[in-house]
């Protein structure tokens, strides 16, 4: 299940957000933005962009695999060489440098663009439209306020904490 996520798309969407000068672009904001992109895309196009699974966290929806990778970076954990998360981590680090910033009560990750440019050919035009819509809507917003917006979404509000946020769409023909 772990290798189904499209890390190249995740890395590229972070590059796109850096290019668009999204404010307060920490690991937390990236996590919430990924959820909103997948949620919106699923709602309107009936498929996810990143193939990630999201769980309801205490403060916001958490992308399971991406959050795990961010925790590994934040805690400077060493992975065994046969750990498949190494491949995902490498894919992310091929595109971005990640700066670990120790705050008083938590660790924050900031993303730094390297040589790689955003590759829009990885996304179809509907995906680009969804990504652009979410980025434009939340470009200036703090992660706390975006998280609050997530809790206005019924499926997020009604899912118990720690459970997978399941999307069920009924099509009436």
Per-region residue spans from a language model:
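Domain-edge interaction signal
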Residues: 1-173
């Amino acid at each position: 299940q772990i290798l189904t996520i499209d890390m190249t798309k995740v890395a590229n969407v972070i590059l796109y957000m850096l290019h668009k000068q999204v404010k307060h672009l920490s690991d937390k904001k990236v996590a919430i933005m990924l959820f909103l992109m997948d949620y919106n895309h699923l709602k309107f196009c009936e498929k996810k962009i990143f193939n990630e699974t999201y769980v309801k966290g205490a403060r916001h929806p958490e992308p399971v695999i991406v959050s795990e990778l961010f925790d590994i970076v934040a805690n400077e954990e060493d992975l065994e060489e046969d750990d498949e998360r190494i491949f995902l981590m490498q894919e992310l680090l091929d595109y971005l440098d990640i700066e670990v910033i120790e705050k008083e009560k938590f660790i924050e990750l900031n993303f730094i663009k390297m040589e790689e440019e955003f590759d829009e050919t990885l996304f179809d035009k509907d995906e680009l439209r969804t990504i652009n819509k979410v980025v434009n809507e939340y470009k200036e917003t703090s992660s706390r306020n975006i998280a609050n917006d997530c809790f206005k979404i019924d499926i997020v509000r009604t899912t118990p904490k720690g459970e997978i946020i399941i999307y069920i769409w009924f099509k009436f023909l």
